[in-house]
């Protein structure tokens, strides 16, 4: 077909030469309704400087137009420098300054056009641009269907929309929807973010990006997002199919993640996993709310926080877990429980975090377990503060009090302080318990294992005496200013009473061991998490 048209062009050029040779003749021709078809697909010649009619054979005649050519087909207008219309082939071809105006908003420009009149399909090449008043598409060649308002390029293309530039090897432009489907080596550059993917849907009117393939997004802050499905628009986004967000040392993965940069908030839903490599923690939860600019996170839906250690990781669960950057100032607040703290608003240390856990708090590690109603932990002092009916277990030993502070060092238990109504109970046999109670207790750990404990203030004990054969010989029921308790492999080994001591050593036959209980005795074994699985029940 192209060979045929080049022959026609050659003939037409000869004819044009004869036209140009006529001096003093008015060349501009105003033509209102000359057409090469008589149906709804007819092409009307609106104007041209020169028009030549040429009959090639009995079945073929062509019209050659040159100079300011204007054509119309339906709502589409065509402009060019020269054009050849072929009524038998139902096509026309145009050269130089080619322009198609499709309705009020679409304009296509190129150096060359081959147009199938009956199918309303335009094949353009040579510096092709398509504009919809919102964005400009540039490509070496373009197929544009005026019936469907769909443009297709397969030799690479670029779209510029304000400050956003998109490139791909293939593209499909849907004019009525103002959407472009970019395919194969898609790249988006914007001052606020960059996108790399294999497939992308982009709306030129709303500047919305829709992801339908594996996609990587890197924003101006360095935050990296990996997703397979979702959308991104003006700082608002929603991602599906387990996207991942990497923000500094924090990696967040969930079934669905949404964020709004204007408010600095994000939300992750469904099997959420948050890994903080700087802090050595992993958070697993059903739902996560995050204040990104403040690095605050609120986890609900059976959250599990893991403090990773080389040998003995610590697992923490609660109804709700909150974590944030640690403020510098910590001051007393007497309106709260004794020994609790209030965090003042001040300049923050971006390397330290704190954790708050609320309701049904459980802790599990191989060396110790604990439960309480609420908990506070800070990287600043590495102390776990357990509030409201706390219980801590270390092997056979149960420790209770109004408040318990567990000090850690190098991610291992180091010290222990129990405030008010302190008590330690060690089960030595069925229904037989060694017990020490006091106002306050302080303990020490060696290599993460409970080594010793000192009881202060109104200290009292019930201790079962055994001979070398482990036969029970008596019961020591005493009071003292101080009581020191020593452990061997975390089992209670001996008790030493210091200061003023009063009490009685009862022969084992005179007392019922099951009745030997201190006033605050309560065995909480049913509350104790026995494994990591117990934390999730």
Residue ranges and their predicted role:
Residues 24-537:
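N-terminal amphipathic/hydrophobic interface segments
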Residues 1-28:
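Bacterial Sec-dependent N-terminal signal peptides
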């Amino acid at each position: 077909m192209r060979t045929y048209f080049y022959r026609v062009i050659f003939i037409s050029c000869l004819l044009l030469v004869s036209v140009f040779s006529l001096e003093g003749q008015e060349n501009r021709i105003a033509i209102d309704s000359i057409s090469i078809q008589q149906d709804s697909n007819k092409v009307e010649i609106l104007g041209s400087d020169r028009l030549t009619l040429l009959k090639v054979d009995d079945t073929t005649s062509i019209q050659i137009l040159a100079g300011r050519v204007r054509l119309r087909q339906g709502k589409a207008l065509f402009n060019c420098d020269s054009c050849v219309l072929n009524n038998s082939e139902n096509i026309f071809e145009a050269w130089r300054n080619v322009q198609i105006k499709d309705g009020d908003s679409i304009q296509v420009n190129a150096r060359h056009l081959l147009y199938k009149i009956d199918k309303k399909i335009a094949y353009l090449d040579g510096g092709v641009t398509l504009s919809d008043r919102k964005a400009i598409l540039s490509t070496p060649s373009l197929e544009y269907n005026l019936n469907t308002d769909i443009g297709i390029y397969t030799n690479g293309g670029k779209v510029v929309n304000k400050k956003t530039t998109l490139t791909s090897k293939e593209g499909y432009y849907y004019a009525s929807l103002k959407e472009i489907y970019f395919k194969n080596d898609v790249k988006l550059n914007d001052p606020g973010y960059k996108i790399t993917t294999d497939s992308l849907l982009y709306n030129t009117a709303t500047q919305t990006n829709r992801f339908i393939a594996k996609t990587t997004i890197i924003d101006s802050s360095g935050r990296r997002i990996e997703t397979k499905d979702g959308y991104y628009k003006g700082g608002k986004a929603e991602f599906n199919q387990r996207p991942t967000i990497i923000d500094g040392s924090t990696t967040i993965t969930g079934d669905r993640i949404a964020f709004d940069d204007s408010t600095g908030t994000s939300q992750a839903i469904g099997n959420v996993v948050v890994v903080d490599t700087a802090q050595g923690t992993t958070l697993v939860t059903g739902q996560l709310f995050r204040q990104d600019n403040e690095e605050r996170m609120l986890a609900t839906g059976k959250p599990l926080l893991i403090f990773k250690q080389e040998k003995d990781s610590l697992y923490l669960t609660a109804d709700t877990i909150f974590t944030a950057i640690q403020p510098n100032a910590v001051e007393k607040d007497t309106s709260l429980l004794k020994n609790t703290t209030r965090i003042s608003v001040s300049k923050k240390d971006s390397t330290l975090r704190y954790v708050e856990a609320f309701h049904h708090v459980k802790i599990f590690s191989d060396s110790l377990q604990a439960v309480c109603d609420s908990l506070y932990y800070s990287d600043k002092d590495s102390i776990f503060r357990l509030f409201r009916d706390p219980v801590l277990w270390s092997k056979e030993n149960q420790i209770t009090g109004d408040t318990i502070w567990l000090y850690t060092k190098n991610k291992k238990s180091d010290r222990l302080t129990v405030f008010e109504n302190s008590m330690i109970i060690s089960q030595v046999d069925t229904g037989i318990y060694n017990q020490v109670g006091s106002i306050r207790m302080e303990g020490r750990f060696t290599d993460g294992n409970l080594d010793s404990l000192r009881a202060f203030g109104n200290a009292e004990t019930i201790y079962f005496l055994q001979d070398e054969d482990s036969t029970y010989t008596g019961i020591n029921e005493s009071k003292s200013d101080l009581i020191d308790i020593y452990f061997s492999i975390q089992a209670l080994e001996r008790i030493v009473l210091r200061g003023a001591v009063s009490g009685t050593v009862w022969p084992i036959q005179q007392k019922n061991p099951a009745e030997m209980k201190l006033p605050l005795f309560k065995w909480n074994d049913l509350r104790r998490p026995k494994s990591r699985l117990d934390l999730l029940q």
